[in-house]
């Protein structure tokens, strides 16, 4: 039986998981405010991978809530590719959307290194931090360069773990995850295969306040939300009259609303017309995002947004296989860039995500006094955007143009 590598991608509350290792050379200082052509190129490739993965989820879990962190999954797989060689490595990066002829491996590695550095760059009023942990079996001998890279270049915590005691290993990993996620995720790993010799755990912590927080006194406790033609549920509905960037895409039959966080992040709510969700999902791409970015116009909106929490857990193994990552799971897997030990292969890739949308922002907390801007007298002249049926949600970081989180809310009452 081959020894297994277990990849855990953890996302919570707007929190998630990411892992990455380094390319040759030293990390250069990153300046998140400085334009970077490589980052923008990568953001387009990463966005297209995100939408391809999203469409896989719609097939596997039709009519269900979807929520995951694309940047987490991409960065974790790139990290894995650093330890992979030959066709194992090629399949991973090509599944992510990279063409090694156009974008050499070293450029991909440096690009993700700078991406992670930029995302971790301190920003006032925005908590965004990527962390990594590597649990290595006591008998595994990782290559010194690989170990040095993940420790020094990506500040990865490395633990020596006794995987011969499966119960104790699970407890060690789950305790670390629970501590790092401030108790949001408990008992993440329920099952480890007996031959597991390495576990990679990656997370993003994200917390931000709306630039225009909602007044809780205006939240309606029970409002109808349409799940399908015959089913509605009752949800709390937040309300405000405010200026937002928005548009109606006549080609895709959807309304797009941009809600800014107080610093360097934004949420895009995509509300298709009834019966048009599938056509909108099929059209989502990096080009679509660029088009919307050009066309969004700021104006007064009478806005109704549900207050909700959702979560999603995925076993990515079968999904990644269908998308093209096959050698990594096979007996022919080549992880000789990670260890000289033979026979290492990928066992599983687990991903968990949790989201809360409330009056203040992405997490429930004491709500400060709400400052109201001057509102127009003739409110009936302004568009009403009522998010009262299934919608897509994207959360992006501005400086890197990265999709931190992507999802679809079908039923906001299903936590």
Curated annotation (Swiss-Prot):
GO terms for biological process: thyroid hormone transport. Gene3D superfamilies: Alpha-1-antitrypsin, domain 1 (2.30.39.10), Antithrombin, subunit I, domain 2 (3.30.497.10), Serpins superfamily (2.10.310.10). Keywords: Glycoprotein, Secreted, Signal. CDD domains: serpinA7_TBG (cd19555). Thyroxine binds at residues 293, 398. GO terms for cellular component: extracellular space. It is found in: Secreted. The keyword Secreted applies. Its main location: secreted. One of its GO terms (molecular function) is serine-type endopeptidase inhibitor activity. InterPro entries: Serpin_CS, Serpin_dom, Serpin_fam, Serpin_sf, Serpin_sf_1, Serpin_sf_2. Glycans are attached at residues 36, 99, 165, 253. Residues 1-20 form the signal peptide. Major thyroid hormone transport protein in serum. Belongs to the serpin family. This is Thyroxine-binding globulin. The gene is SERPINA7.
């Amino acid at each position: 039986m081959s020894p297994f590598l277990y990849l855990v991608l953890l996302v919570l509350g707007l929190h998630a998981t990411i892992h990455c290792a380094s390319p040759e050379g030293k990390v250069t200082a990153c300046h998140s405010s400085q334009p970077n052509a490589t980052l923008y190129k990568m953001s387009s490739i990463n966005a297209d991978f995100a939408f391809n993965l999203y469409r896989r989820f719609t097939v596997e879990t039709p009519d269900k809530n979807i929520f995951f962190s694309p940047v987490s999954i991409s960065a974790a797989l790139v990290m894995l590719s650093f330890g992979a060689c030959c066709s194992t490595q090629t399949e991973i990066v090509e599944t992510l959307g990279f063409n090694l002829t156009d974008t050499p491996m070293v450029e991909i590695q440096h690009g993700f290194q700078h991406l992670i550095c930029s995302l971790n760059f301190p920003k006032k009023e925005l908590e965004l931090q990527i962390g990594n942990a590597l649990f290595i079996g006591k008998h595994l001998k990782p290559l010194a360069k690989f170990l040095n890279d993940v420790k020094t270049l990506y500040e990865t915590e490395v633990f020596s773990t006794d995987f011969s005691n499966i119960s104790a290993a699970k407890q060690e990993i789950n305790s670390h995850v629970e501590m790092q996620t401030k108790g949001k995720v408990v008992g993440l790993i329920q099952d480890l295969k007996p031959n597991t010799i390495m576990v990679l755990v990656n997370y993003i912590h994200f917390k931000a306040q709306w630039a225009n927080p909602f007044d809780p006194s205006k939240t309606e406790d029970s409002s109808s939300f349409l799940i399908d033609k015959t089913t509605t549920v009752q949800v709390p509905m937040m309300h405000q009259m405010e200026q937002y960037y928005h548009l109606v895409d006549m080609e895709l039959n959807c309304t797009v609303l941009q809600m800014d966080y107080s610093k360097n992040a934004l949420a895009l709510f995509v509300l298709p017309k009834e019966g048009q969700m599938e056509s909108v999902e099929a059209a989502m791409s990096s080009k679509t995002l660029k088009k919307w970015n050009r066309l969004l116009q700021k104006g007064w909106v009478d806005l109704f947004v549900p207050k909700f929490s959702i979560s999603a857990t995925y076993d990515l193994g079968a999904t990644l296989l269908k998308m093209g990552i096959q050698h990594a799971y096979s007996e022919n897997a080549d992880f000789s860039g990670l260890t000289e030990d033979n026979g290492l292969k990928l066992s599983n890739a687990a991903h968990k995500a949790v989201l809360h949308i409330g009056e203040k922002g992405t997490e429930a907390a004491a709500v400060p006094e709400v400052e109201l801007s001057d509102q127009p007298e003739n409110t009936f002249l302004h568009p009403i955007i009522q998010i009262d049926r299934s919608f897509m949600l994207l959360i992006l970081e501005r400086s890197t143009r990265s999709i931190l989180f992507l999802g679809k809310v079908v039923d906001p009452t299903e936590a």
